């Protein structure tokens, strides 16, 4: 497992990519600001972007009967949103919102799929 000390990312997943894999995805990464309460994913909707959080926290929220919601997960700088994309899916299982305003690296799902397929060979 790699842990590159000289790369300009705080996200633990990006820091652990091999130098070759990181070089192949960097042209497709874009740093974006994510204000608090920004909706990153919506239940049963197509996942538009995968976010590698650099700081802050995203909340994963499940819809319950009778209009109630419950938090089922948190994503921080050690993870990413859109994990279903890595498994071949394209739709979100839950809503995901930014809880704390911070920055992230945005990535198109198609590039994420290609990276995962290459890594599994």
Where do the language-model regions lie?
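Active-site cofactor/substrate anionic-group-binding motifs, chiefly glycine-
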Residues: 68-70
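Non-catalytic regulatory/interaction regions at protein termini and inter-domain linkers
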Residues: 1-16, 22-24
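Local beta-strand/beta-hairpin segments that build beta-sheet-rich folds
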Residues: 40, 72-73
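Short histidine-centered beta-strand/loop micro-motifs
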Residues: 39-45, 61-64, 84-86, 115-116
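Regulatory nucleotide-sensing modules
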Residues: 15-51
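A residue-level structural signature of the nucleotidyltransferase/glycosyltransferase Rossmann-like core
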Residues: 6, 14, 50, 72, ...
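Cyclic-nucleotide recognition modules
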Residues: 73-121
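Glycine- and acidic-residue-biased ligand/ion/polar-headgroup-sensing regions
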Residues: 37, 47-66, 76-80, 96
């Amino acid at each position: 497992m790699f842990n590159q000390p000289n790369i300009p990312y705080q996200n633990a997943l990006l820091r652990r990519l091999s130098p070759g894999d990181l070089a192949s995805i960097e042209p497709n990464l874009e740093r974006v600001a994510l204000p608090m309460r920004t909706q990153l994913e919506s239940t049963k909707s197509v996942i538009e972007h995968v976010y590698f959080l650099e700081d802050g926290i995203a909340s994963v929220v499940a819809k319950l009967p009778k209009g109630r919601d419950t938090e089922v997960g948190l994503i921080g700088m050690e993870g990413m949103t859109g994990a279903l994309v890595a498994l071949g899916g394209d739709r979100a299982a839950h809503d995901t919102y930014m809880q704390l305003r911070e920055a992230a690296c945005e990535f198109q799902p198609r590039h994420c799929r290609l990276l995962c397929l290459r890594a599994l060979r």
